[in-house]
Amino acid sequence: MAHTTPRSHPPPHSLLQNLTTQSLLLSHLFTLIASPPNPNTSTQTQLNQVYSALQLSTLDLSGLVKEVGHHQEAYRRLVEKKNEVAGLEMRVRGLVKRLEEGRKELEGMIDQGERSLEDIQKSEREPVPAKTLMAHAQSLSKHSSAPVSSLLAPVDKAQYAPWPTEMSMRMGLLFQLEGSMSGMGERGVVGEEQKAPQKVEERREHVEHEESGRRYDPNAVFQLDLNSDESDED
């Protein structure tokens, strides 16, 4: 009844097979012990066989345990190597990505250099006259030159009036009123009740007639002689 576990199976299968064999041997051993002695069969011989099979199975189990330990250690090292390889792969991917970016940048620099070289060669083949360049620069200077500072330019006193203009007074008032041309405005406390403005009734002016026979002309213009003294002298 001796049983040898084949080493070709994986460790979990070998362990399960060994434990099953030991369970069967122990059940057979308990059956022999519990059964009454039979004179026709030798009980002692059967007990010795079961005991020997249990010893062999136990030795096989100890070997399997050692083998599983070595297997687990090898698997742990394999996992470490796998993680290390994954990290190296990420680094390699990053390096490849940066190399690709550098390659594109280098190609752009080469293209720009080739275009610059073509422009230089074209300018050498077709030089622009100095007069044309000066005329172009003078036409651009009207729009690109910086304005002359008022501190350096001569001051024309004839263009300034001895009194402030209306615009300067308005600008001064605008600065004082912080941007409002309509005055400071109404102020009040938040939540304060404001009285409604009273309506002012428009009253028509009463026309007084000096004489009942004369007609009142509102559009009449009266010219008064203010130089009465001069008229008297004349």
From Swiss-Prot:
It comes from the Eukaryota. Residues 188-234 are annotated as: Disordered. Disulfide bonds: none annotated. InterPro entries: Mediator_Med4. GO terms for cellular component: core mediator complex; mediator complex. The keyword Coiled coil applies. Keywords: Activator, Coiled coil, Nucleus, Transcription, Transcription regulation. Residues 71-124 form a coiled coil. Its main location: nucleus. It is found in: Nucleus. GO terms for biological process: regulation of transcription by RNA polymerase II. Component of the Mediator complex, a coactivator involved in the regulated transcription of nearly all RNA polymerase II-dependent genes. Mediator functions as a bridge to convey information from gene-specific regulatory proteins to the basal RNA polymerase II transcription machinery. Mediator is recruited to promoters by direct interactions with regulatory proteins and serves as a scaffold for the assembly of a functional preinitiation complex with RNA polymerase II and the general transcription factors. PANTHER family: MEDIATOR OF RNA POLYMERASE II TRANSCRIPTION SUBUNIT 4. Belongs to the Mediator complex subunit 4 family. This is Mediator of RNA polymerase II transcription subunit 4.
